């Protein structure tokens, strides 16, 4: 069954990514999409990891757009798409999708809240940015969520203290 093989490669991609082996992760995601070109879980993770590295942003945007079209109320997919738009400098568009993500997630993660702050800041809404950075800072790490690095925690605290966006 091609969908099972696709899911297997997708899981391999996630494992490689967790181990910091991004080239292998991307190869696994590519294989996953060969077996099932509509695997939206693969597309979302692949697109997000590319955006975090600021690599192949057009490819990331295309994949992420497909996930949002497939599941328009999925806050995770909306956050990924908003973040890719942010990385491409499309701040107003990013804000629109981030607002949809926030509306569709009753309990947003630290990452989503920080992304919201970053997007609002770059879209010119500095007070709203500060509000979301503070929410992110106050948010406890969920069981299934990767804990932020010390560097990430410090950067968030700097954003709050300096009331401005600080890039990764």
Language model feature labels by segment:
Residues 55, 110-115, 122, 126-168:
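Terminal, low-structured helical/coil segments at or just beyond the last alpha-helical repeat
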Residues 14, 48-49, 83, 118:
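Residue-level recognition of tetratricopeptide repeat
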Residues 3, 37, 72, 106-107, ...:
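Short coil turns that delineate tetratricopeptide repeat
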Residues 8, 42, 77, 111-112, ...:
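TPR alpha-solenoid repeat register
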Residues 10, 17, 51-52, 86, ...:
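Position-specific recognition of the canonical hydrophobic site in helix A of tetratricopeptide repeat
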């Amino acid at each position: 069954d091609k969908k099972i093989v696709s899911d297997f490669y997708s899981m391999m991609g996630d494992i490689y990514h967790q181990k910091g082996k991004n080239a292998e992760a991307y190869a696994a995601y590519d294989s996953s999409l060969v077996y099932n070109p509509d695997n939206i879980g693969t597309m979302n993770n692949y697109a997000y990891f590319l955006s975090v590295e600021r690599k192949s942003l057009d490819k990331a945007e295309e994949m992420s757009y497909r996930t949002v079209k497939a599941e328009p109320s999925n806050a995770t997919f909306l956050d990924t798409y908003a973040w890719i738009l942010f990385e491409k400098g499309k701040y107003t568009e990013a804000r629109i999708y981030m607002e949809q993500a926030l509306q569709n997630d009753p309990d947003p993660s630290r990452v989503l809240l920080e992304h919201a702050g970053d997007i609002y800041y770059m879209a010119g809404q500095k007070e709203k940015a500060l509000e979301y950075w503070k929410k992110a800072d106050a948010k406890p790490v969920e069981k299934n969520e990767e804990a932020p690095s010390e560097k990430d925690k410090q950067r968030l605290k700097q954003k709050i203290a300096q009331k401005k966006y600080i890039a990764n």
